[in-house]
Amino acid sequence: EKISSLIWTRRYWSCGEFKLLVPFTEEHARLLVKENIIIKRGGNEAAEIRYIHITKNSQGMEEIEVQGKFLLSWIGKRILTTQIIAKDTTQNILYAIVKQTCTNAGAARNIPNLSISTTDADTGSGQIDYTSEQYANAQLAAETAAKAAKLGIRVLTNARTGKHTFSVYEGRDLTAGNTAGNAPCIFSQEFDNIVEQEYTNSVE
């Protein structure tokens, strides 16, 4: 169906979010309900619908607005019941946080169809002495550790099987002067990849 607008915000070491606006139809109303999962065609990161708002615009057309969070937010529904004290790589510590709270936490606490990736590349994050806060929110613990090591975390979704995988990865340097040989990613009106821009200067 026709989409009025889609804002799909990916984040590197934290949870992304989306906002979708579509014309009101019976099919859209049936599919776009809270807790349903949405994924872009050809994509591998999904999001859960958490907010629905139906409006009538200035032309008299009804529209459905839905918003939600990427599936990394599922980890935020769990806490660390046992403190993690380890000397290991940040990558393995991130796996341990999710394993303890989401995939090897017992039948009552495991998140269905969620597993930990076994094919992630070694990020070379190096060993650290790590001590988690007891009863910390699992998502907050993972995001804090990932940010400290400059690692990306995400939940990948296989749309065909309905399986979800927690993954840790290292970002690529796409700046104009990068030394890794990566093609730079440049946003410019000259390249017609900036539609709108806005500047705000505030003391509040």
Predicted stretch roles:
Residues 25-122:
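Surface-exposed cap/loop segments at beta↔alpha junctions
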Residues 5-10, 14-19, 32-39, 122-123, ...:
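A generic short-segment signal for beta-strand/edge and adjacent turn/coil regions
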Residues 44, 51-75, 114-203:
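Short beta-strand-centered interaction patches in the first periplasmic/extracellular domains
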Residues 20, 110, 128-130:
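Intrinsically disordered, low-complexity, compositionally biased regions/tails
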Residues 1-13, 79-81, 99, 109-116, ...:
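Generic N-terminal leader segments that precede the first folded domain
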Residues 2-30, 151-152, 187-204:
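An acidic/polar, Gly/Ser/Thr-rich interaction patch typically located in mid-to-C-terminal regions
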